[in-house]
Each structure stands twice: as C-alpha cells, then as structure tokens.
Curated annotation (Swiss-Prot):
Keywords: ATP-binding, Kinase, Nucleotide-binding, Transferase. One of its GO terms (molecular function) is protein kinase activity. This is Protein-arginine kinase. ATP binds at residues 15-19, 162-166, 193-198. The gene is mcsB.
Length: 337
C-alpha cells in the first residue's frame, strides 16, 4: 500500500509529493535516444543501481510488458493515465514498500519521486535527496555550475525539483475564491490547479499546489515557499468553514448527508457527479459529521472511479453506460464497508 493513502489525521491536506529529474553526463536526452542507445542506458543504470542494493527492494517493470502491475501500484496516485501515453520504453523501478519509485526514460533519464500523507514535503524531500545522493555516487549527472542540473525541458533547469501538495478546498471553491487565489499565487511562483476537470470547470475540489520555478532558488527555498503557501490555504479554507452561519452549516450538513445517501445507493453515476458528492462526503469526514467512514475509503474511491482506471480492470473498453454502472459499484463497495 502506498503510504499516503492512509491519512495521518483528518487534515484537508491529502498528500505531499516530491520528484527530482536527472540526466546522465555524456548521454543524449531521452527524446533523442534510439532503441539501441536506450538499451545501453538501461543496462548501465540498472547495473549501477544494483551496486548500491536498491534493486533488491524494488520491482523493475517495463511499461509495455507490465502495465497492469504498474496501474495497480499507481491506484493510489493522481494523474496516472496521461503519464503513460506513448511510453513504450518507460521503466518503473517501484519500491516494494511504496516508499519511492524511480522512472527511467520518462521526461529525463532518471526521475526519483516519493509521496506521503499530509503536509510532509520536507520528510518526502529528505527521502528523495538521500536516494539521489546514493545514485550520484555511481552515476555522473549532467550539471552546470551556473545553471544547475541540465534538463531537456528548460522549465526544469536548476534544481530540477518538482514539489506538490494535494489539498481539499471545497469551501474556497464553492465561494468562487479559487480563481482569485490562483492569480495571486502565480506572482509568487506557485501554481494552483484542480486535478480533475470537465472542460474549463474544476470538479471534485481537490487541488494541486506546486512550484513553477526551479532555477534561481535552492531546494530549501522551494519547499519553504510551498509549505508557507499551503499553510495559508489551509487557514483560508478553515476560516470559511468556521465562519459559516447556523443556517449555512445546516444546509452544508444536509448536502453532506444527502451526498452520502446518494453514493451508498446509486446504481449508475457519471464521473463529475460522483466527484461532486465524494467531495461533500470527504468534507463530512473532515468535519466529524460522518463518523463511520475513513478518508482512506474516500481517497481510494476518488481515484478508482476515473474512466481509465475502470477500463484498465476490464478485458475490453466499456461503453459509457457500463462505465457509470461499474463506477457506482466501486463507490458502493468503498462507502458501505
């Protein structure tokens, strides 16, 4: 089980994720490699990782040969399927305890990532950094004294560090404050975006807070900035909740319990409607209105009801009606246990 899916507490922060990208000195960028060059790269990297005893604790899976295993592993993660498009040579090195995973030949030669519960960016970064140091003892990275780590995408130059926090902001979203906050955060080098969308509309009220800048800032500066912004978002969301009038609270509680009733008894439901109700249910658990459910159950349901997740578990691609029926079944199983 990936560690973040079981929350540390009833925090509105779901998880923290850190990923660093590295290229190997003297080797062309991933997008420029032919099949033979990729195989040489793979052989070299796996050999070096074996020398530092990383592989003994991991599954090594090539996407085109082991997609089902990778999908199962990533059921506890966000934004999976786009990640997999046209990645025939993508290699996943997945820690058996879910502590980290290494990606070879994705955006860059090497990607190291870790995810954990709550607002835990420093702890997550420490794990990634320690692993990066071990690998760097055996592999020489592409590094420039002025530019930092060299990457094929100029947006990743410098630290090549991407830090993300996943956070539930239903009250800020319902009060139409998200757009204002998004614009303000851009000025501070931070992106706030919904992880689920329907056209131009945010759905599900789960947002990703992440850094834009990787050049001209240290890793510590990036993490400190993101933690500070996240704490401000938490405070603003809690203020919205605390300042509800008596009538507003009664209406919200009714919406929460109605949503739970719908989801526990629905036979067919589309994704956007399901995410809307699951957000209410999650809020109900966070506020203590719903006491017989865990956030783990809600987290799992939100991820497993996505169309690509449902289709992956089926021998053939489902039609729209079949998807809606299976989605309802997944939700009932998650919320009635």
């Amino acid at each position: 089980m990936v560690q973040w899916i079981s929350p540390l507490d009833n925090s509105i922060v779901i998880a923290s994720k850190v990923k660093i990208l590295r290229n190997i000195k003297g080797i062309k960028f991933t997008k420029l490699l032919n099949e033979e060059e990729f195989n040489d790269l793979l052989s070299m990297v796996l050999g070096r990782l074996k020398e530092i005893d990383i592989l003994d604790k991991c599954y090594v899976v090539k996407l085109k040969d082991g997609e089902e295993k990778i999908i199962d592993y990533y059921k506890e993660n966000f934004g999976l399927i786009k990640y997999f498009e046209n990645k025939d040579n993508l290699i996943f090195i997945m820690n058996k305890n879910g502590e980290f995973n290494i990606l070879l030949n994705e955006e860059e030669h090497i990607g190291i990532e870790c995810t954990n519960s709550g607002l835990s960016l420093r702890e997550v970064y420490s794990k990634v950094d320690n692993l990066d140091d071990l690998i760097e003892e055996k592999i020489h990275y592409s590094f420039d004294s002025e530019l930092g780590y060299l990457t094929s995408n100029i947006k990743n130059l410098g630290t090549a560090l991407r830090a993300k926090v996943f956070i539930h902001l239903p009250l800020l979203s319902s009060n139409n404050l998200i757009r204002i906050i998004k614009n303000a955060l851009k000025e501070e080098g931070i992106t706030l975006k919904s992880i689920y969308n329907s056209g131009n509309k945010d759905v599900g009220n789960i947002y990703e807070v992440s850094n834009i800048k990787t050049l001209g800032m240290s890793e510590k500066d990036i993490l400190d900035s993101l933690i500070s912004i996240t704490n401000k978002l938490i405070l603003r969301e809690k203020n919205q909740r605390d300042n509800l009038s008596k009538d507003e609270y009664i209406e919200l509680k009714d919406d929460i319990l109605r949503s739970l009733g719908v989801l526990r008894n629905t036979y067919s439901i589309d994704r956007d409607e399901a995410l809307k109700y699951l957000s209410y249910v999650r809020l109900g658990v966070e506020l203590g209105i719903i006491e017989d459910l865990s956030l783990k159950s809600v987290n799992s349901a939100m991820i497993e009801i996505q169309p690509d997740m449902i289709n992956n578990s089926s021998i053939k691609k489902r039609d729209i009606q079949s998807l809606k029926i299976e989605r309802a079944k997944i939700i009932r199983n998650a919320l009635n246990t």
